[in-house]
A protein has these predicted regions:
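A domain-start/cap signature at the N-terminus of enzymes
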Residues: 18-92, 117, 232, 279-283, ...
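Serine-hydrolase catalytic machinery in alpha/beta-hydrolase-like enzymes
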Residues: 54-84, 90-163
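Short beta-strand/loop motif that positions the catalytic acidic residue
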Residues: 214-218
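Alpha/beta-hydrolase fold nucleophile elbow
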Residues: 161-173
Length: 292
């Protein structure tokens, strides 16, 4: 597993969120207040229980801390969101959110992403009328490819970085996964590694001809049959591909920060395997004399 310095922070944040959610955001009763309550008969207990409000429902998705994005003005384009790499380098991860999705979902895996490289999150090019501030994606793959390349150039110019626009790890979720599939179909040389989260339809093998590695993932509580079938199609065709199952989560959820970081770390390890071990050179054997 890649560097796990993020593990302590993610664990603490996840535990705090779970405790907070379990108590409905309220402070738990103290031991003194609990012990001071007077005993009552079973009949009174039953009446009190019947009239008491129901316990607060746990959230469907475990809340995550919004990423501490740097937001860059992209001129005529929508502002782009940037997270730096843990260690400066050329690797860049581009995130494409889902249909009218929350770009802050990246908060579920910030440290793991930072160990991969800098992260750039774009917003869809079409506004969602019923969800102000949310966006969806058109089917213009050429325009999206150009937006990604401009965003990388802008980040490089702003920070004097040297992110490689021809070696992008592309991460699309739900509708963003569809757009990622379209991008690698036409511009695979720029996107050699692709992560497809919760793709809503079966992947087409012919769209991945020049991709080096494909990771597909879905939640245990959603229908993953087509995701698994698509990954199996790719494997059968000889691609480096794998399906990852996120336990106990539904569509649109990464399971919180601890689970999200663990999952993305494993996925990125798969996409970028360690270099092969080079065996030390052996001494050449002495030449054999040929009988005269």
């Amino acid at each position: 597993m890649r560097g796990a310095g993020w593990l302590v922070t993610a664990s603490a944040l996840t535990l705090a969120a779970l405790v907070h959610a379990a108590h409905g955001g309220e402070k738990p009763p103290s031991a003194s207040s609990a012990s001071s309550a007077s005993p009552s008969s079973s009949g009174v207990d039953a009446i009190s229980a019947a009239g008491a409000p129901p316990p607060p429902a746990l959230p469907t998705h475990i809340p995550v801390t919004p990423p501490n994005y740097e937001v860059l003005d992209a001129g005529s384009d929508r502002p782009i969101r940037v997270l730096p790499a843990a260690t400066p380098g050329r690797r860049v991860l581009v995130y494409l959110h889902g249909y009218c999705g929350d770009v802050n979902a990246v908060g579920a895996f910030v440290p793991a992403a930072a160990h991969e490289g800098a992260l750039i999150a774009l917003l869809g090019d079409q506004p969602c009328k019923d969800k102000p501030g949310r966006f969806k994606w058109s089917t213009d793959s050429h325009a999206l490819d150009q937006r990604i390349q401009r965003a990388i150039r802008l980040v490089n110019h702003t920070h004097a970085w040297d992110l490689d626009g021809s070696d992008v790890t592309l991460f699309g979720y739900s509708q963003g996964a569809l757009r990622a599939e379209a991008l690698v179909r036409y511009y695979a040389k720029r996107y050699p590694r692709v992560i497809l989260g919760g793709p809503p339809r079966r992947l087409k093998v012919e769209h991945f001809k020049h991709v080096q590695a494909i990771a597909v993932f879905g939640g245990e509580l959603e229908d993953t049959s087509q995701m698994i079938a698509g990954a199996e199609d790719l494997i059968a065709a000889g691609f480096r591909a794998r399906f990852f199952l996120l336990p106990s989560v539904d569509h649109g959820d990464f399971g919180g920060e601890l689970a999200g970081n663990l999952a993305l770390s494993e996925i990125l390890d798969f996409l970028s395997p360690p270099p092969p071990v080079i065996e030390p050179a052996t001494e050449p054997a002495a030449p054999t004399k040929v009988a005269q």
